[in-house]
Amino acid sequence: LGFNYAPRNYYIQNENRRVTFVNAGPEYYGNIQIGIPNVFQSYFEYSQVKLGLTVRKLWGAIGRTRINGEVNALFGVVPSPLQTVYVGNQSFIYNTQAYNQMRIFEFVSDRSISGTFEHHFNGFLLNRVPLIKKLKWRSIVGAKVIFGSLDSANYKLIPKEYNGVQISTFKALDNGPY
C-alpha cells in the first residue's frame, strides 16, 4: 500500500494514457508492506514502512536541483532479498538511481536513512567552451548518503556459503565507513 502526494504536479489525460508534468516543489511519498505467513504461500511475518520527501527547485539559467530524503524501517526477521538492498553502480557512467562506485547488491539494511542531492547545470558551465559545446556534455554535482543498520537476527540469515563454496555476501552498513 503506497501513496504519492505532489501538490504542484499536473496531469494531462486522454483515452489511452496519462502524462505527468513535474513542477518544482515538494513531493511526499510512502509505502507500507506487510508479510502474512501462509497467505499466497508466504513464510515470513514482517512489516516495512518507507517515507520520503523529494524537493525540486528550478534556478533558471543556472540549472535545477533535486533533494531527496528517505526513512525506511523493517520489523520482523526476513532474508536479505526482502530487506532494503542498495543498488550499486560499478561503471563510471552516472546513474541517478544507484550509488556510484559501490558494488552491485553489496549492502543491505533493515533500518536506514538516506539522502540525495543533485544539481544539473544544464550546460551553464560547459556551453561556454566552444569545442566542448559541440560534444553536448552536461555537468552534474551530486552527493548520496546512507546511514543504516542490520539487526543481528536478520544478519544471521545471510548465507556465507553455497554447497561448500564460500560466496561473497551482503554486508551491513554498520561495519564502518565505506
Predicted regions and their residues:
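Exposed, low-structure sequence patches enriched in small/polar residues
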Residues: 1-178
